[in-house]
Curated annotation (Swiss-Prot):
Keywords: Cytoplasm, Hydrolase, Magnesium, Metal-binding, Nucleus. The keyword Cytoplasm applies. It comes from the Eukaryota. One of its GO terms (cellular component) is cytosol. This is Phospholysine phosphohistidine inorganic pyrophosphate phosphatase. It comes from Rattus norvegicus. Its cofactor is Mg(2+). Mg(2+) binds at residues 17, 19, 214. It is an enzyme of class 3 (hydrolase).
Length: 270
């Protein structure tokens, strides 16, 4: 008990991962993880600031929020920090015109972006779109550029759907890095800029915030690198070996979001 009180003291803001923490995606909209709907509601009734922080790149924010609302979650589009809008801002600021290797579900986020005569490649979780033809075209675009720029929406290895584990964008990103001899710019977790933008949105300093996620590297490690605390839930992509990871150790491990919220609210003012 004393250990938890020390780990959670002074927390004013909570960043929540979505996939694997709130719900598992999949056919029919996926399924809420037991206890997570009420856990989010309890957090939002508390004095704690809450921000949803996701690497979701198969759905637009609007579509993702719609799925979650239908599952019963209290969430709005403006409460979500996601990589596609952040990427669009970067593209505009730097005058980049992307060749897109992304899922059709997120393409609407790029409607205002100039894609003529591409001078970079943007890759996301394209799902079935990761064909040889599409990967090779992205490779060709990069190789034709004097200074190739590859932007990746996250770099996750895999995630969990209701039907099982699914390959994420990271493996495909690494293939293009290797083939082209370049290093991708990652927008999304574990990028420090991504976490900082989420914290800025709720007006909380890193040392006052805690991340709750299922990814030991992207969620936990990334948050800790920014000076935040982080809890790992034993849902979603969690594997038992995560608790013995050679490089990253969470500030605590909990069975699910409901347990994390119980602990946070119990020790909120201690």
């Amino acid at each position: 008990m004393a250990a938890w009180a020390e780990r959670l003291s002074g927390v004013r803001g909570v960043l929540l991962d979505i996939s694997g923490v709130l719900y598992d995606s999949g056919t029919g909209g996926g399924a809420a993880i037991a206890g997570s709907v009420e856990a989010v509601a309890r957090l939002k009734r508390s004095p704690l600031k809450v921000r949803f922080c996701t690497n979701e790149s198969q759905k637009s924010r609007r579509e993702l929020v719609g799925v979650l609302q239908r599952l019963g979650f209290d969430i709005s589009e403006g409460e979500v920090t996601a990589p596609a809008p952040a990427t669009c801002q970067i593209l505009k600021e730097r005058g980049l015109r992307p060749h897109l290797l992304i899922h059709e579900g997120v393409r609407s986020e790029f409607d205002d972006i100039d894609m003529s005569n591409p001078n970079c490649v943007v890759i996301a979780d394209a799902g079935e779109g990761f064909s040889y033809q599409n990967m090779n075209r992205a490779f060709q675009v990069l190789m034709e550029l004097e200074n190739p720029v590859l932007i990746s929406l996250g770099k996750g290895r895999y995630y969990k759907e209701t039907s099982g584990l699914m390959l994420d964008v990271g493996g495909y990103m690494k293939a293009l890095e290797y083939a082209c001899g370049i290093e991708a710019e990652v927008v999304g977790k574990p990028s420090p800029e991504f976490f900082r933008s989420a914290l800025q949105a709720i007006g909380v300093e890193a040392h006052q915030a805690i991340m709750i996620g299922d990814d030991i590297v992207g969620d936990v490690g990334g948050a800790q690198q920014c000076g935040m605390r982080a809890l790992q839930v034993r849902t979603g992509k969690f594997r038992p070996g995560d608790e013995h990871h050679p490089e990253v150790r969470a500030d605590g491990y909990v069975d699910n979001l409901a347990e994390a919220v119980d602990l946070l609210l119990q020790h909120m003012d201690k």
